[in-house]
Amino acid sequence: FLRGAFALCAGLALVPPGQAQETQPDAAASAPKPEAKPRDPNKGSETNLPIPRYVTLKGSEGNARRGPGLTHRIDWVFTRPGMPLRVTAEYEHWRRVEDSEGMGGWVHYTLLSGVRSVLVTQDLAEFRDSPDPNAEVLFQAELGVIGRLLACTTDWCRISTDGEKGWVRKTALWGVDPDEVLE
């Protein structure tokens, strides 16, 4: 046995330095590789949904972390159920989100919902009967009220909050883009 092992080692030593032993080419390695399609920077790498986009906090609390993973420290805690959040990045099961004030971090996707909501950003927002500045005012909502987004035209959004529905000027809301139209 020792002679065979010695002969093998001696045979390997005969290969001149800097030269590799011949190998058979791998058919898969020599096959043409398909071109990778460039990733759309306006789509999420995990979901292929638009980036940025708006989502809603599902529960009563959501930890926003410094990075995408449980080992990263918690920088912020969202505490308003239904709060609209803007997704700005994706990494595996994590979404980078921010609120209306730009606060945020990485949140696990299970804490978020695709149901849309908006935040009233004016002291008093008038909810009207139709998307018209002369339409009857049904009620008013104070700064910070969260409502469910039902529809949007170019200038108005139909919102539901506390069982009431009405049309609000888009400029009085956060959670919908200025050019966004929803039917």
Residue ranges: model-predicted function:
Residues R3-A13:
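Bacterial N-terminal signal peptides
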